[in-house]
Amino acid sequence: MKRLSLAIIFACCTLVMAAQDAIRVNHQGAKPTFSDFITAYLAPTYGEDGECDTEYMNGIRDAWERHRKGLKLDEGDTFTLDAKNGFAVYEYKYSEGACEFMTRIEMCLWNEADGKHKLFAYNHMFYRDGLYYPGQYDGLTFMRYDNATRSMKYHPDKGVEAVYEEKSPSVECSFALPRSGKDIIVVFWDENGKKTEKILKWNGHGFSY
């Protein structure tokens, strides 16, 4: 697999997400649950040609539906939902020859300090033999939910942007969303697979780096 610059991928994802309409978060009770956010984000979208724009999400979409219905997941799939802490993770593992591959997708939800908004994150990562190996769809995306409109829109984060601006072109970076706490771990990977970590600190409405 050709390794793509994560900065380029991030920029492309930003343009695509910014062009999308707001995502409606449907819910039954007085306020949406974490599961409602997941369902809304994973819902397929279609272009003017009638083709699905998010086929790359079919794996996690299918695993989520199976998990919700209590059905057995496909071989290699796992899905963990921690609704109390607003965290979910999907993993798909497979082998090709002597290599072991894994797709890992994390989702997380934060309540903003103003009490009027929430921040939803979707974090896609790909690994080969335990090392980060970014592909076409890797990256961290944020959606900001407005209680008044019951919808969420793409929301760039200044802290994440600062990470990409600072890092060396020869270094890749991945993110680890929190299952406990509110801060995000940034993992920097050099060309030899050595990694160092820094923290993106939650500030009540986004992240500071």
Where in this protein do the model-derived segments appear?
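Short, surface-exposed coil-to-beta transition loops
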Residues: 100-105, 120, 129-140, 169-171, ...
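Short aromatic loop motif centered on NTY/YTY
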Residues: 151-209
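Mid-length scaffold segments of soluble, non-membrane domains
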Residues: 115-155
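Structural signature of eukaryotic scaffold interfaces centered on beta-propeller domains
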Residues: 104-114, 172-180
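Terminal domain-start segments
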Residues: 20-110
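Intrinsic-disorder/low-complexity loop/linker signature
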Residues: 29, 50, 86, 96-100, ...
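Bacterial Sec-dependent N-terminal signal peptides
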Residues: 1-23
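Short beta-strand segments that buttress and anchor functional surface loops
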Residues: 89-93, 121-127, 184-191
